Amino acid sequence: MTNEERNNLIMSKLSIYLNDYSDYINESMINNIKNEFGFTTLESYKIILTSILDITDKEIIHEFDKIVYELDKSVYEDNLYYKNINLKCISSNKWKFEYKSYKPYEAFVFNDLRCINDKLYPSIGYFKDEYKYPCVLENDREWMLITPNEIETMKVPISEATGNVLTYGLGLGYYAYMVSMKDNVESVTIVEKDKEIINLFNEYILPQFKNKSKIKIINDDAFNYFKKD
């Protein structure tokens, strides 16, 4: 099997599973494997998942060690934004806050796709217990989430931020908040074209920032601002 064929096989099967069956695996299934074979929870999970995906190639099955991860929800619940920013206050005719959740053992993408020696490795995670994450709805449709994927994929940009930071797009202000908490960041300029999002942020979220004085918001299109700058 070529690497391209391998990549297509893994990506296509996982895509279907994540879209349609992400919460199929449950604690009872895990315990059956653990009790019968003495495997760990993670080992049992990977056995069940590769069986559901009908993957029989032993080399690919072994590679799921680099694809599937058991996550510790306390790591994400200890995140500064998660702990300190209360989104429950958001409420209007258009905007509404609520908690969504991942069920125990529900599979989801928690980090970026990796490529090693021309082989693609998705980052699939699960929690052993229910994990709740904040979600803001716009006209009853999901607008912005703060999930483990958001937290993980922002780690490097946040760690590299220093001095006077410029970022395009406001969202729920996760990136802006996290970099504003750094001592080596002097200011955070955010370019956002949607005035309603800016108003939402200024009314409900910015007042909760410890270092709100570092924040400057420019109401403009990112491409227009880049050209002017």
Give residue spans per PLM region.
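N-terminal auxiliary segments of SAM/dcSAM-dependent transferases
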Residues: M1-F127
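S-adenosyl-L-methionine
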Residues: D194-D229
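Conserved SAM-binding loop of SAM-dependent methyltransferases across substrates and taxa
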Residues: L172-N184
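Active-site and NAD+-binding cores of ADP-ribose-processing enzymes
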Residues: K119-S123, K155, I215
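Structural motif
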Residues: V165, D183-E186
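Class I SAM-dependent methyltransferase Rossmann-like catalytic core
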Residues: T2-N7, Y69-K73, D78, P134-E160
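Conserved class I S-adenosyl-L-methionine
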Residues: E160-G173
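Conserved SAM-binding motif I beta-strand of class I
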Residues: S187-E192
